[in-house]
Amino acid sequence: MKVIFTQDVRGKGNRGQVKEVPDGYAENFLIRKGLAKAATPQAMSALRGQQRLEEKKEAEKKTEAEAMKAKIEDDKTVVQIQSKAGEDSRLFGSIPSKQIAQALDKQYQIKVDKRKIDLKQPIRSLGFTNVTVNLFPGIDARIRVHVIEQK
């Protein structure tokens, strides 16, 4: 029996996938528990429509990410962060990705999730640092972060 998986089933199939499974397994387990539904012509056309909608949303997210990348990588976009520092330009504390995301939002009204900022280690010194932001799979932007001494 052909079924359309409505949820991920370990070892059998992923959500949205159409697969051939034994009749008893499909009727007694998958369909009863709501993990899959029978692959009728109506269900197949609904699945195709849903996949087209998801592809459209994905394309919109990609164009939005590309526009954000252009805005971020503009030469004038330099995120300035003030922090207390010692004699040898070393900071008291550090600048984590959360602080960079907040400064980017405050200075340029660009909202970026702190988990998308690829910062191997927090910034611990004054000056310029290039930081990579993963906006979308395959679309990365570089932010210039300028840490200046707070007086």
UniProtKB/Swiss-Prot annotation:
<dbReference type="InterPro" id="IPR000244">
    <property type="entry name" value="Ribosomal_bL9"/>
</dbReference>
<keyword id="KW-0687">Ribonucleoprotein</keyword>
<dbReference type="InterPro" id="IPR036791">
    <property type="entry name" value="Ribosomal_bL9_C_sf"/>
</dbReference>
<comment type="similarity">
    <text>Belongs to the bacterial ribosomal protein bL9 family.</text>
</comment>
<dbReference type="Pfam" id="PF03948">
    <property type="entry name" value="Ribosomal_L9_C"/>
</dbReference>
<dbReference type="InterPro" id="IPR020594">
    <property type="entry name" value="Ribosomal_bL9_bac/chp"/>
</dbReference>
<dbReference type="InterPro" id="IPR020069">
    <property type="entry name" value="Ribosomal_bL9_C"/>
</dbReference>
<dbReference type="GO" id="GO:1990904">
    <property type="term" value="C:ribonucleoprotein complex"/>
</dbReference>
<protein>
    <recommendedName>
        <fullName>Large ribosomal subunit protein bL9</fullName>
    </recommendedName>
</protein>
<dbReference type="GO" id="GO:0003735">
    <property type="term" value="F:structural constituent of ribosome"/>
</dbReference>
<dbReference type="InterPro" id="IPR020070">
    <property type="entry name" value="Ribosomal_bL9_N"/>
</dbReference>
<dbReference type="InterPro" id="IPR009027">
    <property type="entry name" value="Ribosomal_bL9/RNase_H1_N"/>
</dbReference>
<dbReference type="GO" id="GO:0019843">
    <property type="term" value="F:rRNA binding"/>
</dbReference>
<keyword id="KW-0694">RNA-binding</keyword>
<dbReference type="Pfam" id="PF01281">
    <property type="entry name" value="Ribosomal_L9_N"/>
</dbReference>
<keyword id="KW-0699">rRNA-binding</keyword>
<comment type="function">
    <text>Binds to the 23S rRNA.</text>
</comment>
<dbReference type="GO" id="GO:0005840">
    <property type="term" value="C:ribosome"/>
</dbReference>
<dbReference type="InterPro" id="IPR036935">
    <property type="entry name" value="Ribosomal_bL9_N_sf"/>
</dbReference>
<dbReference type="GO" id="GO:0006412">
    <property type="term" value="P:translation"/>
</dbReference>
<keyword id="KW-0689">Ribosomal protein</keyword>
